[in-house]
């Protein structure tokens, strides 16, 4: 029997032959029948009559020629798919034995051998190919100490411009120059470097900026921050966010930070708490809410030492820390977030263990000794007792690598380092999740492309005498200063890995004719393609988002959400799979097949996080099967089917292009946060209403009549 299935976006409509039996799941043992050949249908893409379209290689290429239209809500991607049943008893990860899809008027067979275009050696040596066909390659970043810098064709290198800032670390500069980048200053305006060239940079490593300023970032440019990460970078905001989660889910889950009071707001509460513990000589540590590198920090035990008007955070002091050789120490962890929608978190395998330069004691008389109670390198390097560590593999001096520390704990102290590492990963995920709601809202409101942002965090953790990790603070611009061979050993590979995971493309303005004078190879897929990173959704994709974010049962969305992948789904998945190829030294700790419990803690259900939960559940044990599935879809160009403009009345759509936006003014960050949160609230209400409408149109999401592979 042959069942004809029309797939529109995510929806599945079944039209069996007149004499067919009732439809059964694909694994029910129906005999396989070859379908009759069909005429090639015309593509069903609705556009305005005034649009000037061009058809290239059977695909409609109107991405840059379309303008917003009132009819954009009816834009949809239609295909017809013949599903052939399979009676084989062999285990398989794919749901369908064969899919033949009519895509934009061209019949394609995803299971045929995929032919990849071969790039010239000069280009292949400086780029990293994607795992997937019809996805542009990524620029390759080599380490800072690479003795043979990359050789890049002049037609590409002239566009590899990196905008310098006052805080761009030296190790980042060395990595960039070895990788073929030209470093430009924002004030550069000479004959050799005219002012307009400073606007064409493709990367920048700078300070965090106000959320509205992210709207000025162009397509094809990357910034090393997301909007709103001050929500975890400021000690007061971090505590408030964790406090909300702790109140909702319990201290056992979110009691990861020592009890903190934000002054002057919490002055009365702190006074009451202080009086309860005054007889115990309780120690407290005072910190400015937004400082770094130990500035303004002191340990106190008397109420008179507490500032009464100045904004500070007062935190209960962990008075029984884990000691090594009699000294207190903390851990600097490096955490990379490459995406917020979906949330993807990486933890660097190495880091720093920073020791206090004076041996620890808990006498009240010692509280003024900063070299005993504070572990910041910026403070302890000034101590006469400070000893640098010149050997990154040695357990000596006042700074060790994280790898060396864990080896020491395992061999010398018989510590279960695997369990300790798992508890640290749990702390990191909860820390990022605590600010996810605001970061998500501000990113949606101010960032126009998924390509624009990534962020490296420095998370400081203290171990108590029971080896419980305590969160101290989060740095949104962690120091990459490398003053010793040990620092270089840790931070050098870190920088190149971060830049490779950020996945930069060759700029779209690259002159392809100059790269292929002989025209003996295809380079049309070489530069950056904005369709891969669009945040715009078709109506069908939006409806699928609404339905699957309103499903409460996890097993339901695990069973159904992958049945029919949309083009937007495929774009998200191929980006994540390409990242996993180059996470050298980085471990993706979220999402994994075992992190679904953290989805409960998010500000609300997120479609992409559920998509990845299902993907990891199904394919984490057999990544090759998942990659092969995506490769077959990409071979058809399916992932490049992207709406050129947002849907009408789409509250989640990004802001207009930079040329039509108001200039970023000094709007207080709190105001932009409130605006974004209000938009998020409106979006939630609209989502509920639209989901109900979608359910009325599409029917309830019962188990699907056919177990479909993603439509090709």
Could you say what each language-model-derived stretch is?
Residues 156, 223, 254-256, 289-294:
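Short glycine-enriched loop/turn motifs at secondary-structure junctions
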Residues 2-216, 229, 233-248, 255-257, ...:
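Acidic, PEST-like segments
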Residues 270-277:
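Short amphipathic alpha-helix with an adjacent loop that forms part of the alpha/beta core around
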Residues 459-461:
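Hydrophobic residue at the +6 position relative to the catalytic HRD Asp in the kinase catalytic loop
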Residues 464:
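Short, acidic, Ser/Thr-enriched surface-loop or helix-capping motifs
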Residues 259-261, 280-307, 322, 331-332:
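Glycine-rich phosphate-binding loop of ATP-grasp-fold ATP-dependent ligases
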């Amino acid at each position: 029997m042959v069942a004809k299935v029309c797939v529109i976006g995510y929806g599945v409509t079944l039209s069996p032959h007149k004499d067919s039996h009732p439809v059964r799941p694909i694994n029910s043992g129906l005999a396989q029948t070859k379908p009759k050949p069909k005429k090639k249908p015309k593509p069903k893409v609705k556009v305005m009559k005034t649009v000037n379209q061009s058809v290239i290689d059977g695909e409609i290429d109107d991405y840059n020629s379309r303008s917003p239209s009132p009819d954009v809500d009816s834009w949809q991607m239609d295909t017809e798919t013949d599903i052939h049943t399979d009676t084989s008893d062999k285990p398989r990860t794919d749901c369908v034995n064969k899919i033949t899809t009519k895509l934009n008027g061209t019949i394609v067979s995803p299971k045929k051998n995929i032919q990849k275009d071969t790039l010239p050696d000069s280009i292949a040596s400086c780029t990293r190919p994607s795992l997937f066909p019809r996805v542009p390659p990524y620029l390759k970043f080599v380490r800072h100490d690479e003795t043979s810098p990359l050789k890049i064709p002049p037609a590409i290198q002239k566009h590899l411009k990196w905008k310098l800032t006052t805080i761009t670390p030296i190790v980042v500069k060395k990595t960039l120059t070895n990788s073929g980048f030209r470093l430009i200053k924002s004030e550069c305006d000479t004959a050799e470097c005219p002012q307009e060239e400073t606007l064409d940079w493709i990367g920048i490593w700078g300070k965090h900026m106000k959320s509205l300023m992210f709207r000025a970032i162009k397509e094809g440019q990357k910034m090393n921050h997301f909007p709103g990460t001050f929500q975890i970078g400021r000690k007061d905001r971090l505590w408030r966010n964790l406090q909300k989660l702790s109140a909702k889910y319990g201290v056992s889950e979110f009691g990861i930070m020592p009890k903190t009071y934000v002054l002057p707001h919490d002055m009365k509460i702190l006074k009451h708490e202080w009086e309860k513990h005054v007889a115990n000589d309780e120690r407290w540590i005072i910190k400015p809410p937004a400082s770094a590198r130990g500035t303004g920090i002191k340990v106190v035990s008397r109420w008179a030492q507490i500032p009464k008007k100045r904004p500070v955070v007062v935190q209960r002091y962990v008075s029984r820390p884990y000691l090594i050789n009699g000294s207190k120490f903390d851990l600097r962890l490096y955490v990379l977030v490459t995406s917020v929608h979906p949330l993807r978190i990486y933890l660097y395998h190495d880091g720093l263990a920073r020791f206090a330069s004076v041996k620890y004691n808990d006498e009240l008389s010692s509280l003024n000794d900063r070299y005993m109670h504070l572990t910041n390198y910026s403070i302890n390097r000034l101590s006469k007792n400070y000893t640098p560590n010149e050997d990154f593999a040695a357990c000596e001096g006042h700074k060790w690598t994280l790898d060396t520390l864990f080896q020491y704990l395992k061999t010398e102290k018989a510590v279960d380092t695997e369990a300790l590492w798992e508890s640290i990963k749990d702390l990191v995920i909860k820390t990022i999740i605590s600010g996810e709601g605001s970061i998500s809202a501000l990113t949606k409101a101010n960032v126009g492309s998924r390509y624009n942002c990534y962020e490296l965090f420095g998370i400081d953790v203290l171990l108590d005498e029971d080896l419980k990790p305590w969160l101290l603070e989060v740095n949104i611009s962690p120091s990459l200063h490398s003053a010793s061979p040990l620092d270089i050993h840790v931070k050098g590979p870190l920088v190149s890995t971060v830049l490779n995971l950020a996945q930069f493309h060759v700029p779209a303005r690259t002159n392809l004719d100059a790269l292929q004078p002989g025209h003996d190879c295809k380079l049309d897929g070489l530069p950056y393609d904005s369709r891969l990173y669009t945040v715009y959704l078709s109506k069908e994709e939006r409806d699928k988002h609404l339905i699957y974010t309103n499903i409460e049962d996890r097993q339901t969305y695990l069973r159904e959400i992958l049945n029919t992948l949309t083009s937007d789904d495929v774009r998200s998945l191929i980006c994540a799979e390409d990242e996993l190829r180059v996470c050298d030294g980085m471990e993706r700790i979220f999402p994994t097949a075992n992190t679904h419990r953290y989805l409960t803690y998010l500000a609300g259900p997120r479609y992409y996080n559920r998509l990845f939960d299902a993907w990891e559940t199904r394919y984490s044990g057999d990544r090759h099967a998942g990659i092969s599935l995506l490769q077959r879809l990409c071979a058809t160009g399916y992932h490049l089917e992207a709406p050129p403009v947002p849907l009408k009345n789409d509250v989640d759509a990004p802001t207009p292009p930079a040329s039509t936006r108001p200039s970023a003014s000094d709007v207080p960050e709190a105001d932009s946060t409130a605006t974004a949160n209000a938009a998020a609230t409106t979006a939630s209400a609209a989502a509920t209403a639209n989901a109900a409408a979608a359910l009325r149109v599409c029917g309830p999401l019962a188990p699907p009549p056919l177990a479909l592979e993603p439509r090709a």
